Amino acid sequence: PIDTTDNASLQRGAESFVSYCLTCHGASYMRYNRHRDIGFSNEQILNKLVYTGQKVGDLMQSAMRKKEGEEWFGVVPPDLSVIARSRGADWLYSYLRAFYRDDSTVTGWNNLVFDRAAMPHVLYQLQGEQRLTIKSGDKGEQKSLLLDKTGNMTVAEYDKFVGDLVNYLV
């Protein structure tokens, strides 16, 4: 559930974004100092969110150069400050929970929400590994995901983690 007044959730989401997403995805319409709005002090921003020698007033740029992203993934990883607003919270939440193992792809991962996404499942150690199951029936194919290998988090913990991350991004 999205609650932009829940500063604890927003702070957890900000820390998760910096730890897991900012290497490849920028949030270039956001400055680090805006994290004061959710209760971080400048010192906390520098200690918890800025790892690349940037200043508190700088834009949140990806550490990856666009050329590298295109070489590695075939496409430049999108800016998540744009994706969150264009796709919305429900889409992003579903997307981050819908990765599954797929040996036919370059990354070894696919996504039930966005087929053939170039992004590998960077959160698989937290969520675990899912596999796609397809059942045919009267209403056509029914696709679902089953957890094959558990991750470091329970399903409920991972759902909360993703919820905090999405809450922060939107």
Regions found by a protein language model. Name each.
Residues F40-L112, A117-Y158:
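Electron-transfer interface patches adjacent to heme c in soluble/periplasmic c-type cytochromes
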Residues P1-E15, G26-D37, I45-L46:
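Electrostatic cytochrome c docking/interface patches
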Residues T23, R31, D103-T105:
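Secretory-pathway/luminal and periplasmic proteins that interact with or process carbohydrate-rich
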Residues G13, L80, L165:
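Residue-level signature of catalytic and energy-coupling elements of molecular machines
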Residues F17-S28, L165:
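The canonical Cys-X-X-Cys-His
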Residues N152-V170:
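Juxtamembrane amphipathic/hinge helix adjacent to a transmembrane helix
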